[in-house]
Amino acid sequence: MGPDRRIVAAKPRVHEVASELGVDSKIALAKLKEMGEFVKGPSSSIEPPVARKLRAALEAEGHLPGAGGDKTAAQASPAPRPPRPATADGSGAPKPQAPMSVAERQAAAEKAASEKAAAEKVAASEAADAKPAAGAPADTAKPSSPPRPSGVSAPRPGNNPFASNQGMGQRPSAPRPGNNPFSSSQGMGQRPSPSNIPRPAPPRPGSPRIGAPRPGGGQRQGGGGRPGFQQRPGSAGGGAGGGLQRPGGAGAGGFSGPRTGGGGGRGRGPGGGTAGAFGRGGGKSKARKSKRAKRQEFEMREAPSLGGVTVPRGDGGTAIRLRRGASISDFADKIDANPASLVTVLFHLGEMATATESLDEATFQILGEELGYKVQVVSPEDEDKELLEGFDIDLDAELEGESDEDLEIRPPVVTVMGHVDHGKTRLLDAIRSANVVEGEAGGITQHIGAYQVWTEHEGIERAITFIDTPGHEAFTAMRARGAQVTDIAILVVAADDGIMPQTIEALNHAQAANVPIVVAVNKVDKPEANPAKVRQQLTEFSLVAEEYGGDVMFVDVSARNNIGIQELLDAVLLTADAGLDLRANPNKDARGVAIEAKLDKGRGAVATVLIQSGTLRVGDAIVAGTAYGRVRAMADENGDPVLEAAPSRPVQVQGLSSVPRAGDTFIVTEEDRTARQIAEKREAAERNAQLAKARKRISLEDFTRALEEGKVEALNLIIKGDVSGAVEALEESLMKIEVDDSVSLRILHRGVGAITESDIDLATIDNAIVIGFNVRPDVKARERAAREGVDVRFYSVIYNAIDDIESSLKGMLKPEFEEVQSGVADIREVFRSSKFGNIAGVIVRSGTITRNAKARVIRDGVVIADNLAIESLRRFKDDVTEVRTDFECGIGLGKYNDIQVGDEIETIEMREKPRV
């Protein structure tokens, strides 16, 4: 049997496939749903691979093609061809077939396919025996055709109603102009031929035909008769084209491969365009396909379909690595798919997104599970590592390649952590003999400070680098970015307060960073101090003091009275010497981390950096996060200029293009261009990650519900601060505020430095509130804000800003109302009035009855009428506004008259419910 020709359309519809198999469309739709295909209805078109899968599934259940299928197949495709005989030895019998007429095709719907094929084969064989074919020399040369006697070059006129030489005797002629609207020779009296080849003359009887098949040749592309029909054996090759046809041409009278040597007729071969004496169009003409087109066609045929689109599938274990903030286009490039198809698949999964929109990891996980891929979103550290490897920078390889001769001892880096107001900064002031606390607003540390202190330990002057953090936010951010800058953590606990929630949180962060801890029990000079209680409480968190048999050093100190400071420094150095290998290579380009950064009006971007390895010098090209530039000047914590900084040395660096974030790593590059390119790529990656983070996932149901209920309220903010660490801590704290799903918080812009006109312009466009943290607007920005009515708020304490924003968010919530009973009256009498209707004579049993109040009528404890209004309220023929308990009055309920003696009238009012 030939190939399956039941599907004639490129994308058949569901009802066509169902009709072909003789099943109901609902059964086909149910089967498609079981197969995981998303199809709306019977008129939906499906891809050919899906149609094949559907047909195979239905046939496997016993739904074989019946009457409906026969009819569809007969109307949609030509008659099936008989099997070809073997032609290897050249002795096989010919395969003559007579073309089917219109009547035959109509009758085919009523007969069985096997009976049709047998009848046609017998009729064709008899006709072939009666009329031997002409052109014996050419036919003899063809292996698939037996030798034929030459003598008659054309069949008897009138023998074949579909032959191109019908009624023309032995002389073939061109098709009549206008007979076939699809013919290439329409309106012309001659057959088409190439311009450089003369038009062939009609063949003489007994002479070889011009259009005879080539020896051993097969079918030309696009040649042959009508689909499913073969030329009559021995008919003259009167059709235009023939052997002189260009490759890929579709002239009438082409040949159908190794089947017969006939050539007359206007039809085309399988896949041809023009066909039939009555102008019935055949299939689309096929040109010669390139290898790429054939490969794409094969891949499309083999690819599975989902949601009406064709997408490649994985085996469930194929890993796809994506960067943060990747889009559907990036995922499509990884799996070699069409982004539009993935958008459709994601839509059917309940997620709406564009092809270029940055998506979060959860969305890619859903899409990957559906398609059989394991999606892995690289972490920020791995992403930055891969980015640097693109510039031939491998920090891990540098550390592994260092030998012991290159390493030198460096000072330990110590981070002071603890609960708010437990004396962290006061302790550092005592160590440095300074007074930083007085400079902080409210006595709360809101900046990160880095200092280096020299102390004498066992007769040797040694340096210790201290980092003072504002609570735990900055330390969390550093740990999240892999900036392990801390060697030792000092946990400050007040002896009078003991363990507090933030103490536990700081302890957890220090243990997660895997750094040794030294506990400083502060405020031991207070009368209510209880250091033993602190030691006992910390044993629950695996911090056992040495005097209790543990390995953690506890030191009792008093920062105010300068008690135990030297003992604390000795404990830090002993802990560092006992369990840490504090060495670094100073003889290479500097590597480190930005501790803090700010925008100075005279000096520009100033970053406090801590060198971890190498030596930083003035003039080096440096990149820190998304900021880059050359080191123009360096200074220590006291403001003294520094020409070079060794490992574990904190310095202030000037010359960066922008303000880096707290915790950003910095490296020294050979050229400014390299630093700029790294910064630009980091900025692009960070922007995509922020877009994916800010994107709110919404399902189709949520989207419909939002449309019905109205838009979601949003509070837009612009944050400007003096240092990047404070801005970041404020942003993280604000994003943690949870009020209600109907109100959202959007931070449009955050930055370091004074409030500028551009900030006011952005706030004007998006109706945003500008928050200035320890910064003020310039004169022009202040005037612009007053003119545009932009709300600009200034804060110096971070907690005040958080409280105000939370109050603003609660104020944006839609008020919640609760129903409160205001009064109850019993009906004692009903007065009927033709003008006012029924009037209830009542006595107020409790509360107050107010005119125009909402009311309901209760009869035997059942509400029989609700949402009424007290339209009239009278007492002794006087209109009154309210009637109190134990007083009588008359109540008119407007058009509602179904009241009886003994009913109750209850008045209610809606009061706004205060939010907790």
From Swiss-Prot:
Residues 443-447 are annotated as: G2. Residues 558-560 are annotated as: G5. Residues 120-142 have a biased composition (Low complexity). InterPro entries: EF-G-like_DII, IF2_II, IF2_N, P-loop_NTPase, Small_GTP-bd, T_Tr_GTP-bd_dom, TF_IF2_bacterial-like, TIF_IF2. Residues 468-471 are annotated as: G3. Residues 58-317 are annotated as: Disordered. Residues 195-206 have a biased composition (Pro residues). Residues 283-294 have a biased composition (Basic residues). GO terms for molecular function: GTP binding; GTPase activity; translation initiation factor activity. GO terms for cellular component: cytosol. It is found in: Cytoplasm. Residues 418-425 are annotated as: G1. Residues 409-583 form the tr-type G domain. Its main location: cytoplasm. Residues 214-227, 235-282 have a biased composition (Gly residues). Keywords: Cytoplasm, GTP-binding, Initiation factor, Nucleotide-binding, Protein biosynthesis. GTP binds at residues 418-425, 468-472, 522-525. NCBIfam families: IF-2, small_GTP. One of the essential components for the initiation of protein synthesis. Protects formylmethionyl-tRNA from spontaneous hydrolysis and promotes its binding to the 30S ribosomal subunits. Also involved in the hydrolysis of GTP during the formation of the 70S ribosomal complex. Belongs to the TRAFAC class translation factor GTPase superfamily. Classic translation factor GTPase family. IF-2 subfamily. This is Translation initiation factor IF-2. It comes from Leifsonia xyli subsp. xyli (strain CTCB07).
